[in-house]
A protein has these predicted regions:
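All-alpha amphipathic helical-bundle segments outside canonical DNA-binding/catalytic cores
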Residues: 285, 311, 451-464
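Short Lys/Arg-enriched alpha/beta "domain-start" segment
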Residues: 1-46
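Conserved ATP-binding subdomain of kinase catalytic cores across diverse folds
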Residues: 68-325, 383, 393-424
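Exposed beta-strand-loop-beta-strand "reactive/processing" segments of non-cytosolic proteins
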Residues: 34-79
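Conserved catalytic-loop position in the HRD/HxD motif
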Residues: 371
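An alpha-helical support segment within catalytic cores of ATP-dependent transferases
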Residues: 159-170, 327-367
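Conserved protein kinase catalytic/activation segment
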Residues: 376-387
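Active-site activation/catalytic loop segments of kinase-like enzymes and analogous catalytic loops
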Residues: 392-448, 466-483
């Protein structure tokens, strides 16, 4: 099976996508006027087992579009399945079949409702033919095509004589996706999760490179990456525009999809914590387990990737002050606390200054998760905690996402998550989150092998936790005003000197 360059989407198809894209949950730009500009398109072959007769086979096309607007220049992936508009009628009971067209992707679940119909789709599809347009991330024909063209860590084996390692039976697109689209494929390679990336980063995606490096280390706390799809282009395809000058060695490749093992019986960490909070059940033991796993993750990352120099304390505090000042000017609630916030940074600077004269007293910069919270971990009775989604902030360049950072920033992300779980789960009192935080931090510190002393680690965690809480106050005030009290309570607690 091959992946090949093909024609860009037609103007008729782009008109359809212009209306459809902004309504998607994963669409990365909200409330900002942007243009959708076709950039690159790739055609995929559909395996014979995933289609009907060859004349009726669907077309699978991956379109990369640039989103251009005031201060916006992003790339999104739009995988599409194009089916002939006069396909055979669906069998009784087929759900969401477009205009009487039966799903053409074999044993997988029927695709969702189509985007619409076009006479000219571009992307190598025959002009003048009526095409029914589907979101490829929700269509089995696209799943089959992605699996067939992906690079596999090892060739998938069938489960037995006559079985298909690419069995799409029971496959379903998940409805909870946020920045990407996820598909559960229980019949593929023993059970897998296919992630179709939406906001595309130029360069190696850390959600591929980091889990692969961890798996090579033998670290079992991450779902094993099994396959991935990467595309490339040459210099003539580089996006043109202001600020787009590229160094000769700049990457001209991007990952479009990732297949990882499915953690059977696992539960989302945030949902689990909310359930415990709602029942008034202590989360301390699970929080302590998570602290140990996170310390082990950071140690594995230090083994797998280069470790930098110790953080410059003066630079760090100056950067945190800068971010803090931006938050204070953006929030009236924080503005009323400006004096206390400034005093907090003064105290932090003084604490860290006292240790800068001691060699290696401050933690070294290293590869980290970068966007860690309880929603990025899974828990299963058989496996314990698994860490997911090393992609980082999808809208930031890969070079920024993979820049060495403080491991304690990941710690601060989990610490902040406990407050949200307590609030969303309606914990009976503040003690629930206090106990969870204390158990998590104590277990992390005991298991951590970075060699940072308690006082320094505590000061850094407090500083990084306040930094995150300040960001959350601004975010909630703009997007979910009813939630603003959650991070604001943490700000007050930290300013008062409490953990």
């Amino acid at each position: 099976m091959t992946l090949r360059r093909t024609d860009l989407p037609s103007s008729e198809l782009m008109t359809l996508l212009d209306a459809w894209l902004p309504e998607r949950r994963w669409y990365p730009v909200k409330g900002v006027a942007v243009r959708h500009v076709p950039w690159l398109s790739f055609a995929l072959d559909v395996p014979a087992t995933a289609g009907q007769d060859p004349a009726r086979d669907p077309r699978v096309v991956l379109h990369l579009l640039r989103l251009l607007g005031d201060g916006v220049d992003l790339v999104v992936q739009v995988p599409l399945v194009l089916e002939p508009g006069d396909a055979s009628p669906a069998a009784p009971g087929d759900a969401h079949t477009p205009g009487g067209a039966a799903p053409s992707a074999g044993p997988g679940r029927a695709p969702a409702a189509p985007l619409g119909r076009v006479r000219d789709a571009g992307g190598g599809a025959t002009a003048g033919t009526a095409w029914v347009v589907h979101d490829g991330a929700a269509h089995p024909a696209c799943w089959a095509a992605l699996l067939a063209v992906a690079d596999w860590e090892t060739t998938p084996a069938a489960g037995g004589a006559g079985t298909d390692p690419f069995d799409l039976g029971g496959g379903r697109a998940l409805s909870v996706e946020q920045s990407n689209s996820s598909v559960l494929l229980p019949g593929v390679a023993g059970g897998t999760m296919l992630k179709v990336l939406r906001a595309i980063a130029i360069g190696p995606n850390p959600d591929v490179t980091i889990p692969r490096a961890l798996a090579a280390q033998g670290w079992a706390g991450v779902p094993r990456p099994l396959a991935w799809l990467e595309v490339g282009w040459d210099a003539t395809d580089d996006p043109a525009g202001p600020g787009r000058a590229r160094a000769p060695a700049a990457p001209r490749a991007a990952h479009l999809a990732i297949l990882s093992e499915f953690v059977d019986g696992a539960r989302d960490g945030f949902d689990l914590a909310c359930a415990y909070a709602g029942q008034g059940s202590s989360f301390a033991d699970l929080a302590a387990d998570l602290g140990r796993v996170l310390a082990d993750l950071h140690a594995a990352l230090r083994r797998a990737f280069d470790v930098g120099s110790p953080v410059d304390a003066r630079w760090l505090v100056a950067d945190l002050r800068r971010r803090s000042d931006e938050a204070v000017t953006s929030s009236s609630a924080l503005g009323r606390r400006a004096t206390e916030i400034a005093a907090f940074w003064d105290r932090t600077a003084a604490r860290l200054a006292s240790v800068t004269r001691v060699p290696d007293a401050l933690p070294r910069l290293q590869t980290v998760h970068g966007d860690l919270h309880l929603g990025q971990v899974l828990h299963a009775r058989r496996f314990g905690w698994k860490v997911l989604d090393f992609e980082g902030e999808p809208l930031r360049p890969v070079a920024e996402r993979t820049r060495p950072d403080l491991a304690l920033r990941d710690v601060a992300g989990i610490v902040r998550s406990f407050d949200y779980a307590a609030a969303v789960g309606r914990a009976p009192d503040a003690a629930w989150a206090v106990q969870a935080r204390a158990a998590f931090l104590d277990a992390y510190e005991r298991a951590d092998t970075a060699g940072v002393d308690h006082a320094t680690s505590e000061a850094l965690v407090r500083a990084l936790t306040l930094d995150k809480a300040l960001y959350e106050v601004v975010y909630e005030s703009r997007n979910r005003p009813d939630w603003e009290p959650i991070p604001l309570a943490a700000v007050d607690r930290l300013l008062a000197g409490n953990a």
